[in-house]
Amino acid sequence: MVEIGVGEVIFRREELSVTLLVDVEQLAAVAARAAPGWGKSPLHVHARHAEALFVFEGALALRLEDRVHRIGPETWAFVPPQVVHAFEVTGDEQARYLVLHAPNSGYGDYVRGSAAAFDQQPPPEYATGDPRLVLVRRTGGAEGENITNRPRERRATVLVEADELTISEFDYGPGERGAKPHIHRHHADGFLVLEGAFTFHVRDASHALPAGTLLVIPPGVVHGFDNDSPAHARCFNFHMPSFGFADYMRGTNPGFDQLDPPEDGGLDPASVVVAQLPE
């Protein structure tokens, strides 16, 4: 049985709330809510991993060496390794947002207060990352590459495509079938349900997960998903690392790291992480 957790509360005040939702090798995920003037990070760089931000409410300013991006609601920002960056809440309202680090690279321990092993450094004298590689993508079909676009039935949009992480958006009509049960040998699969509910099939059990649920499936665990509900459902899908998932959806990566369920049933689904995002 997959149980829905609530994550690990790191800090909770009216001005700033930080909850660690996922802390596995392939991904660290933090949900945060911050008032203007709080949650500000200094300019920094990650040498070996990428960072992504999604804004639910309010706005963030993503500062790079040569420009500033305003990240509003329903928008992703993706920062590759070696790119100097910082972010802070902008405007007059609180911001609610999700922070991903892929791979984890010690971020879980970092937010707990142990920074020694985390892959983060002050900006070098000569930065090597090109700030033009930073991606900012609005969701809901507004931006990105639509792989499938049948509004009443199914829309699949690639938002971020990088070695460290692929982020896609799935919008499925009532009763629309998703992926049949399968496994990934060498990478993790994840979902964040945004609207409605998706049914996730994990080994021999099925679980309907509502909006606001984050699910991370480690390598070797059998899983699939459908929209079994009578309403539209929308989610983000993550592959960590990418392994060419976007090309797989385009039909140009037949060797993608995806296999039918093994005869032994795959690995124990107890390692699956399911967390409800805080309001």
Residue map of PLM features:
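Short strand-connecting beta-turns/loops that link adjacent beta-strands
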Residues: 25-26, 48, 92-93, 164, ...
